[in-house]
Amino acid sequence: MKKGRVSQVLGPVVDVRFEDGHLPAIYNAIKVSQPATGENEVGIDLTLEVALHLGDDTVRTIAMASTDGIQRGMEAVDTGAPISVPVGDVTLGRVFNVLGDKIDLNEPLPADAQKDPIHRSAPSFDELSTEVEILETGIKVVDLLAPYIKGGKIGLFGGAGVGKTVLIQELINNIAQEHGGISVFAGVGERTREGNDLFYEMSDSGVIKKTAMVFGQMNEPPGARMRVALTGLTMAEHFRDKQGQDVLFFIDNIFRFTQAGSEVSALLGRMPSAVGYQPTLATEMGQLQERITSTNVGSVTSIQAIYVPADDYTDPAPATTFAHLDATTNLERKLTEMGIYPAVDPLASTSRALAPEIVGEEHYAVAREVQSTLQRYKELQDIIAILGMDELGEEDKLVVHRARRIQFFLSQNFHVAEQFTGQKGSYVPVKETVRGFKEILSGKYDHLPEDAFRLVGRIEEVIENAKEMGVEV
């Protein structure tokens, strides 16, 4: 092992000078350790990752934890390899940090646990699978209008507080309960409280047994937030490549991955580009996203919550992410104000899987008719606001009448929200979803009150609600 010394500390960026011509490779992990000397002192055990070579003997590194207590002249050791994290079944039901150290209260991992480096190249072309298969989520609005693809990348777009994390929790729950699939959850730069709540909720529901969790939260330095997505992805790739699993990989929130990169970029001496983001934004995003894919062995399907700064979709961070996505689920604040949950915008959400050759003719026709009804209703809203419903023709009145029922029927009660709503969650198979909307469009339920359609699963629940309201069915 080659040793060097810390020569400069700039917040989360640390320069290390090595002697006799040894220069660690880019991405190598470098350790700075110092045992605790006094009773009240805490020892230092810091991992740095090489980012740049400066001249013949100095490397500029990014710290994976706080640099408090680091001084010039401290000894630094080149480990000779990138950061490596545990993989395989030992990770299930456990919580890790960016370095793969356990941060839950359970017993330590076995000493012989397999470890893989977090930096690796994407699968080659001949390893990729070209089959398109739909992933059923049991959430009506998603399965009908913007279906997810196995091995695809799905973006969950929305501002603050419109329900991204709740939707992710429901997806983890549904995939584990209905498909028995493995999930990996990477908490990237989000609230520690949310991660804590998610862990306990998943422990209570038993879903945790099928999930590995990795966290680099808001309070951590940018190095940890920038690399924690790769730690989670490495765990997911092992389940895909070595066990042939179809893995769900959640990133909450991919914007924080970009944000962490931009925090470090200026300190690394790079010239900022548009809106102050790092000039390497597209490259960093591509290196992460290209590893998420279906191979001939298994698949990693990624669902990424994407915070949209100031609800501006042209911001470089969300705009760069768009290029990689197969489907988008857009959450709309106006729908939360109307009490429609999940607040998925049925007109703005898209999927390349919504094609007759993939979902079938009937599903495609029903989905398009639902969208055209809602689009017509949206166009009529200005007229209604100015002149009132009475000024509409009979045909338009019927469109509004049905569109409101469709809008409410797109809402659904979630398993993970039972404690807030007091209603049992529902999982709706795609066939049932298509049948329900087809019957609403045919006018079969025009006589039922709109409130009967709120927060239900199958169409039968609407009929039950109507009976409870005293309506003859």
Curated annotation (Swiss-Prot):
It is a peripheral membrane protein. It comes from the Bacteria. It catalyses: ATP + H2O + 4 H(+)(in) = ADP + phosphate + 5 H(+)(out). It is an enzyme of class 7 (translocase). SMART domains: AAA. It is found in: Cell membrane. GO terms for molecular function: ATP binding; ATP hydrolysis activity; proton-transporting ATP synthase activity, rotational mechanism. Its EC number is 7.1.2.2. SUPFAM superfamilies: C-terminal domain of alpha and beta subunits of F1 ATP synthase (SSF47917), N-terminal domain of alpha and beta subunits of F1 ATP synthase (SSF50615), P-loop containing nucleoside triphosphate hydrolases (SSF52540). Keywords: ATP synthesis, ATP-binding, Cell membrane, CF(1), Hydrogen ion transport, Ion transport, Membrane, Nucleotide-binding, Translocase, Transport. The keyword Cell membrane applies. One of its GO terms (cellular component) is plasma membrane. Transmembrane segments: none annotated. ATP binds at residues 158-165. Belongs to the ATPase alpha/beta chains family. F-type ATPases have 2 components, CF(1) - the catalytic core - and CF(0) - the membrane proton channel. CF(1) has five subunits: alpha(3), beta(3), gamma(1), delta(1), epsilon(1). CF(0) has three main subunits: a(1), b(2) and c(9-12). The alpha and beta chains form an alternating ring which encloses part of the gamma chain. CF(1) is attached to CF(0) by a central stalk formed by the gamma and epsilon chains, while a peripheral stalk is formed by the delta and b chains. PANTHER family: ATP SYNTHASE, ATP SYNTHASE SUBUNIT BETA, MITOCHONDRIAL. Produces ATP from ADP in the presence of a proton gradient across the membrane. The catalytic sites are hosted primarily by the beta subunits. This is ATP synthase subunit beta. It comes from Bacillus velezensis (strain DSM 23117 / BGSC 10A6 / LMG 26770 / FZB42) (Bacillus amyloliquefaciens subsp. plantarum). The gene is atpD.
